[in-house]
């Protein structure tokens, strides 16, 4: 595995760091999405990442082993309690982590913040995240989009992951797409198979467009 460069290519126009929150249930593919985004964007943008786990720093370890970013650019946060509390009701532990990473890497273009696995009601505090991406997976059943909840209805981008599993779990992707449109209105969504990189480019395009990132 080739280690990523410690000093990525720089943008010609400097903008304030964009904070991108990635949330979703346990096992939906949040860490995989973060890994794919880091690997695809690290040569263009200066990236740092913060992961949340309740009692461990497992996601930080996984990203480091995968070579998503240099080890010093990934920070693990142990929340010690409900994951949604650390990203919304009392986001102080993550706000402090963001400040620490930006003090180390003041030229960072994007700060990714991955929440711990949580339910459909989890949302990011606007003080912590500029853009929110919520990840669900097909294996949870085709009914998930119509269950609603802030993660489904209010996130800036909904990612419906593991589309390759639809035939195995009896999920109809057309039904999921229809229900998603009903629940989200004009808010965008992307269907992905992250292991095959399907849909990753669409997520990146969304981040660049909505985050006003120009190279």
Swiss-Prot record:
Q: Which CDD domains match?
A: UreG
Q: What is this protein called?
A: Urease accessory protein UreG
Annotated organism of origin: Burkholderia vietnamiensis (strain G4 / LMG 22486) (Burkholderia cepacia (strain R1808))
Write down the PANTHER family for this protein, in alphabetical order.
UREASE ACCESSORY PROTEIN G
Supply the NCBIfam families for this chain.
ureG
Which key words are in the record? Chaperone, Cytoplasm, GTP-binding, Nickel insertion, Nucleotide-binding
GO cellular component annotations of the record? cytoplasm
Pfam families the record matches:
cobW (PF02492)
């Amino acid at each position: 595995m080739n280690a990523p460069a410690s000093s990525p290519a720089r943008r010609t126009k400097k903008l304030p760091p964009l904070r991108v929150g990635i949330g979703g249930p346990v096992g939906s593919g949040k860490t995989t999405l973060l890994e794919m985004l880091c690997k695809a964007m690290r040569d263009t943008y200066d990236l740092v990442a913060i992961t949340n786990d309740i009692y461990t720093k497992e996601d930080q370890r996984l990203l480091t082993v995968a070579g998503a970013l240099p080890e010093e650019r990934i920070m693990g946060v142990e929340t010690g309690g409900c994951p949604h509390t650390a990203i919304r009701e009392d986001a102080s532990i993550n706000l402090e982590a963001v400040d620490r990473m930006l003090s180390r890497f003041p030229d960072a273009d994007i700060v990714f913040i991955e929440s711990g696995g949580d339910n459909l009601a989890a949302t990011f505090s606007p003080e912590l995240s500029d853009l929110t991406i919520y990840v669900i997976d097909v294996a949870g059943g085709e009914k998930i989009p119509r269950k609603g909840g802030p993660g489904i209805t209010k996130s800036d981008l909904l990612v419906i992951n593991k589309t390759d599993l639809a035939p195995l779990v009896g999920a109809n992707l057309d039904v999921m797409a229809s229900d998603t449109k009903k629940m989200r209105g004009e808010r965008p969504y992307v269907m992905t198979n992250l292991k095959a990189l399907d849909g990753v480019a669409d997520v990146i395009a969304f981040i660049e467009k909505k985050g006003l990132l120009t190279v």
